[in-house]
């Protein structure tokens, strides 16, 4: 599904990523690992088409993402580590915004029950805890029809039940032929044989 081929990227004229290459098949899960500042978030942004590499190529389903970037980006769901929710909007309003781009998604109240957020559905997201904000951001996974998920530190600030909910959703997505690329400082609660790791 996704091929990253000899990718280079410089930050302030200094090499940050060099000769990055890997293949992520349909049904695959790749865990990007590396210390702070190693370029994990930057690599996700490159794959999402938000940054341009100095060298190298990114292929999605054997075609360069540059060929039709807009169509490619409709095939991916990117959840960054800063959540990307509007703090002035309620949970409901943030979800309605996302559903606008993914019509046919399940009901918002039903989604909120996944993380026991239904009683907060009309609260401004700026009043939520960091863990609750993360949960709202991750609800996009249930609203998305994208084949490729790019998740930057999706497990941060989650309680044990929320963590299990996300891992279950990732596994369901893979079973349907989707692919997941994620960063995390913590080990994944999965059998090591069930996913690949790439160290930056």
Swiss-Prot record:
Protein's UniProt name: Cytochrome c biogenesis ATP-binding export protein CcmA
Species of the source: Legionella pneumophila (strain Lens)
Subcellular location as annotated: Cell inner membrane
Membrane topology category: Peripheral membrane protein
EC number(s) given by UniProt: 7.6.2.5
Family annotation (PANTHER family): ABC TRANSPORTER I FAMILY MEMBER 1
Residues annotated to bind ATP: 34-41
Family: Belongs to the ABC transporter superfamily. CcmA exporter (TC 3.A.1.107) family.
Source domain of life: Bacteria
UniProt function note: Part of the ABC transporter complex CcmAB involved in the biogenesis of c-type cytochromes; once thought to export heme, this seems not to be the case, but its exact role is uncertain. Responsible for energy coupling to the transport system.
Residue ranges constituting the ABC transporter domain according to the UniProt record: 2-200
Pfam families given in the database record: ABC_tran
UniProt GO molecular function: ABC-type heme transporter activity; ATP binding; ATP hydrolysis activity
Subunit field text: The complex is composed of two ATP-binding proteins (CcmA) and two transmembrane proteins (CcmB).
InterPro entries: AAA+_ATPase, ABC_transporter-like_ATP-bd, ABC_transptr_haem_export_CcmA, P-loop_NTPase
């Amino acid at each position: 599904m996704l091929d990253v081929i000899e990718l280079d990227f410089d930050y302030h004229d200094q090499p940050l990523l060099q000769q990055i290459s890997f293949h992520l098949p349909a049904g695959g899960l790749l865990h990007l690992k590396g210390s702070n500042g190693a370029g994990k978030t930057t690599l996700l942004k490159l794959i999402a088409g938000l940054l341009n590499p100095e060298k190298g190529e990114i292929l999605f389903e054997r075609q360069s993402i540059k060929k039709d970037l807009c169509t490619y980006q409709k095939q991916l769901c990117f959840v960054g580590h800063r959540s990307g929710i509007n703090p002035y909007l309620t949970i409901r309003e943030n979800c309605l915004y996302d559903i606008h781009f993914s019509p046919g998604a399940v009901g918002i109240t039903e989604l909120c029950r996944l993380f026991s957020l239904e009683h907060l559905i009309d609260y401004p997201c700026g009043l939520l805890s960091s863990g609750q904000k993360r949960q709202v951001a991750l609800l996009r996974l249930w609203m998305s029809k994208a084949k490729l998920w790019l998740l930057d530190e999706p497990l941060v600030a989650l309680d044990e039940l929320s963590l299990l909910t996300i891992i279950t959703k990732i596994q369901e997505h893979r079973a349907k032929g989707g692919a997941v690329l994620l960063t995390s400082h913590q080990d994944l609660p999965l059998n090591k044989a069930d996913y690949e790791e790439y160290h930056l």
